[in-house]
Amino acid sequence: MLNVKEAIQDMGGADVVARLIPGATKNIVYHWSSANRVGPRFYLRFLELCSKMKVKVDPAKVMNGDKND
């Protein structure tokens, strides 16, 4: 399973993810990548996008971040 940063890269980068998630800007996606988590506002949309693009992520790590990093 990928972390948030790896998932964003796997889906084509911040530009692509920002275009595919309504309401998300490139800056927001860059923040997700650096924080390695997605906030509650876009959490479900991010998981849906990962599912559509067949990118496997751990939902708990998407919401809370990877505590080991």
Predicted regions and their residues:
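Short, charged recognition helix plus adjacent turn
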Residues: 2-7, 15-16, 26-31, 40-44, ...
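Alpha-helical residues within the helix-turn-helix
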Residues: 19
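Residue-level detection of the helix-turn-helix DNA-binding "recognition helix"
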Residues: 22, 34
